[in-house]
Amino acid sequence: MVDTDPNSDLRESSVSRRRFMAAAGATGAAMGIAGCTGGDDDDGTTTIQLSADADFEAIEDEIEAALYDAGLSEDIELEVLPGDFETDSRREDYQAALDANRGDPDIFMMDSGWTIPFILREQVLNLEEQLSDDVLSRIENEYLEASVDTATHPETGELFGVPFFPDYPVMQYRKDLVEEAGYDPEGENWATEPMSWEEWAEMVADVWDYHGGEDEYTYGFTTQAAAYEGLACCTFNETMSSFGGAFFGGRENLFERGDRPVTVTEEPVIETIRMMRAFMYGDEDEEAHPDFPQITNDDLVQYTEEDAREPFTNGNAIFHRNWPYSVVINGEEDAFGEDLGTMPLPYGVSPGDSQYDGLGGTQHALGGWHLTVNPNSQNLDAAIEVVEAFVDDDVMLTVFELNGNLPPVPEVVEAADPDELGPIGRYLDTLAVAGEHTIPRPVTDVWPQQAAQVYQEVHDAYTQEKTPEEAMEDLQEQLETSDQD
């Protein structure tokens, strides 16, 4: 609701702070990777530089304390260099640093979607001979297998990164507004039982209309639909998968290229685009899916994560798709507190109705980040000690509580006391469902190129530059070519 929310000033403050940190991250990445040097200090301590999200700079002291409690030598200090908030830009920064054989930062926080190309180029340290047997065994046996797969060499199976946290989104909503409109989220088990996209959209439209529609709330729903990696890997991938569609004919073809079908012109993929066009343009768009109402507008085609979060946090949207970090922000008492609800993402078709195994039903993009070690570091032993300390349960829980980043070991969350986790503890049931229904991106050495092809063509369809069929026919040709290069 515009300018009438009593908490708007508080929320604006939160947004401004995070925006400042993100902007600082872009500058900090360039400065840190290009010139800041760690190493041995005059007092005998060794400073290990970790390039990570800007958020981690704000909680650096708490993380360092947890690392010491986990056994990290107190002669080692951690310095967080805030990386660019946009994953594509961060990849380019890391590529430049490693191409130049720079020794800093010592540790990179790398997106699981583009770690493998760095592994194949032998630009990050092979950890098989560096980590202790106990740590290697834990990663192999207890960590999420899908996360570990994106941190290992696809041919040799050797480990080159330690999963820092997996990421999978949830649907957030204003529970107070939904209940005022006559719905019963708790009685209907919204937190754990997914709706169909059609049922969900009709409900969103009804709640939005009940509260005055666009005159009172700019959006019924916000998500990420800008032309960037997040559209290809995540919002489009998960929605397409929930309709039973796929880039390359199913899950078995995600990680090996060259001899797999390209299937983006199939009907479930087209239906996904038509639904999104209905959400943004309504029945004024002749390509919009007739079974879905308008619940937002085309501002979405400019939105990445923070762009989509801000209207929701500021009280101008009712539903919002995003990663767990934003649940922490929106669940704070100076935001929505217990008026924030979460639910699994809706589904397009039931699992049994997809021609591909494991598709259909609720699907959540599997994101996440790994810790990789710079092989040019002058402090390799200390860097390895830091990475090993991050494998500790209490370190994982500290990061989870303070920043909403999920532990890579499911049992750590299951054993945690929700009351000790802050706002995120209220939403573990939804996160558990999301974690059981994830879809990875098709990560191969050519995925960075293919991701750009995907998000540009999907974006052209979302912005009405092309029909869904035209965009997917063009994408089909591009993916077939790049898969053979």
Question: For the regions a protein language model found, what residue spans apply to each?
Answer:
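Hinge/lid segment of periplasmic solute-binding proteins
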Residues: 113-170, 232, 353-356, 420
